[in-house]
Amino acid sequence: VQQRWNRRVFLQVAAAAGLLAACSKPKPAPGTAGGGAVTITHLFGQTVIKEPPKRVVSAGYTEQDDLLALGVVPIAVTNWFGDQPFAVWPWAQPKLGTAQPVVLNLDNGIQIDQIAGLKPDLIVAINAGLDADTYQKLSAIAPTVAQSDGDAFFEPWKDQATAIGQAVFQADQMKSLIDAVDRKFADIGQRNPQWKGKKALLMQGQLWQGTVVATMAGWRTDFLNQMGLVIADSIKPFGSDHRAVIPRDHIKAVLDSADVLIGTTESPEEQQALLAARGVAASRATAENRHIFTTKDQAGAIAFSSVLSYPVVADQLPPLIAKILG
C-alpha cells in the first residue's frame, strides 16, 4: 500500500473519528480593510493582506487548485498523494504551464524553515493542519491564511476557495468559478430526472483494517445531491462527522441498500481487492453490477473537491452513473 494513499485515508478516517475535527462554528465572511487591503478572518484571528501577492506559498494539500484557477502560480506547492509532477494534477497542469514550483510536504509537519527561505508575500495554509504555534511562526514570515474553524484539514471546498479568492484580490472571479461548478452539476440533475432520489454510496477505494469507509452526507457529497442522488441512510449508524466506518458484518446490508456505489479506486488492483472483500463479494450490489470504480485521476478529482477538479467529475462520472441508473 502506498504511503501517500495511507496518509490520505488516515486523514479522512481520522477526521471521521473526530481526531482532526472539532465542531464547526459560524464564521464571518472575509472582508476588505481600509486602503484597499483585504482582511481574512480565520481560526487564529485576522490576516490583513495589503496588496495582491506575487510570491504565494501553497502550504496545504489542495490550495494549489484554487490559486491556479485564478491564474496565481504559487512558488511552492505541497504534495498530498498521487505522485503528480510538482504536486499538480492533470486538471490543473495547464494552469501551471512551464512553472516549476518547489514541492513541499507535510510528512513531518509544515516545513517552516524552507518556506521562510522562499521569501513569500502570502502563505495559504487552509488545508495544512495548522495549530496556533505554527500559525504564529508562519505569520512571522508572511501574511498567512489559516483554516476558518476547528477542522484542521478539509474544510468545505467553497469556504476554502472563497477565502483564497479574497486573499489574492479576485473574490468576484472565484465566485463565478464556484457558481459555474454548481450550475454544471445542477444541469446534469435536470437532464437526468430518473436519478432523483436514488440512493448512492461514495466509498474509499481501499478497505480500512477490513472495514469499508464511506462518506457521510455533507459538503463532500453535495455534488451528488445536485445531480439528484441522495446518500443512503444505511451508513448513518456507523458515521462520525465526515466518514462512516462500516464493520465487516454490516458491509453486505449497507451496500445492498444503495442503487449505485462509487468506489474511489486508483487502479484495477484496488478494484479487484475491493470486490473480493468479504461482504462486498457477497452483496447483491456486486451481483447486480451496481458499482462504479474510478480511475486514479477521477479519484483524485473527487478528493481535491475544487473549482478545477469538479468539472472533471461532472464530465466523467455521469456517463458511468447512467450505465447503472439509466
Regions found by a protein language model. Give the residues of each.
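Extracytoplasmic low-complexity, Pro/Thr/Ser/Ala/Gly-rich segments
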Residues: 31-68, 81-83, 318-325
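N-terminal secretory signal peptides
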Residues: 1-5, 9, 13-22
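Proline-aspartate-enriched helix->loop->beta-strand connector
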Residues: 119-125, 143, 257
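Bacterial lipoprotein signal-peptidase II cleavage site
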Residues: 23-32
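A short, structured surface patch at a secondary-structure boundary
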Residues: 63-114
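Basic- and aromatic-lined ligand-binding clefts that recognize polyanionic substrates
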Residues: 55-70, 173-234
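Structured C-terminal subdomain patch of bacterial secreted/periplasmic proteins
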Residues: 254-326
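Extracytoplasmic substrate-binding proteins
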Residues: 46, 133-207, 303-326
